[in-house]
């Protein structure tokens, strides 16, 4: 749930989610109606619990949705769903849990490297905002998610061509965070700062990249470089020797258009830590990581995410 849209799916413990549907959902009332309908539709299946994630930090069993004007709480969800077994977590914690469960065919290597054994993983996703999380190996065979609000850290230019873009965003926002660059709006703002259209969407900009538009191509190259720099920072912050996964609808639209040379150059450009980053692989993960991550919670009898067991699933 991101405050605008809702993704729903049914899952049996240990299996991939099924019956996935996307629904418009911009209010608590609409969410309640969708959940009641879903419970009614699947009443014969025997609901044993629910795993719910929202776009925003989870604090004491509540998430104030960053793209909405209402708050999700565990207590409210339990009452609506009529089950005490409800897990509520940040959407990128769920995305992180899902990333290593994707089938190998859903992974595209965008920075060469060799993942370390029993090493932590970082997961990032520029979309409406900039999601950041990590996974640390569990004491058994699973993963424990590490939640982060790292998308809101300060961000500064690292190359001369990025300075005018930074100054344009600083003039608009004052303090500039990573999310101001690495998001749907961020790509549009980079393009506008280079002289492109002021209100063009990422879809329009990417179409122009495909058509060979030089301004659009430069905007995407800068975006790619900044993404590489941020991915490198995430790898350092989480000691992510197991790799960095990038997953979001925006990145799926970019995919083969990414400037991998610019990405890798900035990913490794970390001074004396460059050698540390050189061997860390980075993957573009294509798929519904969030739903896969939520389904992982149903492998544990108590639905704690510490007990999530990783299993590769085609989805």
Curated annotation (Swiss-Prot):
InterPro entries: ATPase_NBD, Bacterial_glucokinase, Glucokinase. Keywords: Kinase, Transferase. Signal peptide: none annotated. GO terms for cellular component: cytosol. It holds the Pfam family Glucokinase. Gene3D superfamilies: 3.30.420.40, 3.40.367.20. GO terms for molecular function: ATP binding; D-glucose binding; glucokinase activity. One of its GO terms (biological process) is glycolytic process. Belongs to the bacterial glucokinase family. This is Glucokinase-like protein CC_3167. It comes from Caulobacter vibrioides (strain ATCC 19089 / CIP 103742 / CB 15) (Caulobacter crescentus).
């Amino acid at each position: 749930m991101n405050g605008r849209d809702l993704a729903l799916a049914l899952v049996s413990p240990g299996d991939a989610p099924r019956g996935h549907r996307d629904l418009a959902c911009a209010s608590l009332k609409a969410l309640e109606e969708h959940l009641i309908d879903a419970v009614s539709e699947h009443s014969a299946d025997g609901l044993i619990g629910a795993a719910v994630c929202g776009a925003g930090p989870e604090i004491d069993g509540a998430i104030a949705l960053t793209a909405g004007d209402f708050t999700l709480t565990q207590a409210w969800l339990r009452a609506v769903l009529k089950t005490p077994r409800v897990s509520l977590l940040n959407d990128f914690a769920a995305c992180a849990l899902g990333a290593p469960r994707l089938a190998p065919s859903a992974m595209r290597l965008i920075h060469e490297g060799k993942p370390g054994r029993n090493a932590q993983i970082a997961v990032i996703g520029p979309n409406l905002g900039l999601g950041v999380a990590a996974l640390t190996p569990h004491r058994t065979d699973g993963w424990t998610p590490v939640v982060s609000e790292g998308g809101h850290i300060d961000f500064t230019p690292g190359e001369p061509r990025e300075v005018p873009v930074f100054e344009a965003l600083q003039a608009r926002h004052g303090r500039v965070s990573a999310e101001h660059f690495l998001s749907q709006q961020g790509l549009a703002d980079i393009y506008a700062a280079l002289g492109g259209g002021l209100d063009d969407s990422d879809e329009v900009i990417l179409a122009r990249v495909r058509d060979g538009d030089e301004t659009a191509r430069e905007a995407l190259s800068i975006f790619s470089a900044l993404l590489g720099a941020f991915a490198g920072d995430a790898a350092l912050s989480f000691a992510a020797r197991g790799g960095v996964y990038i997953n979001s609808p925006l990145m799926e639209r970019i995919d083969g258009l990414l400037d991998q040379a610019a990405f890798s150059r900035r990913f490794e450009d970390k001074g004396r830590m460059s050698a540390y980053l050189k061997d860390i692989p980075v993957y573009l993960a294509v798929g519904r990581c969030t739903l896969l991550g939520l389904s992982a919670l149903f492998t544990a009898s108590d639905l704690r995410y510490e007990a999530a067991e990783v299993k590769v699933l085609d989805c």
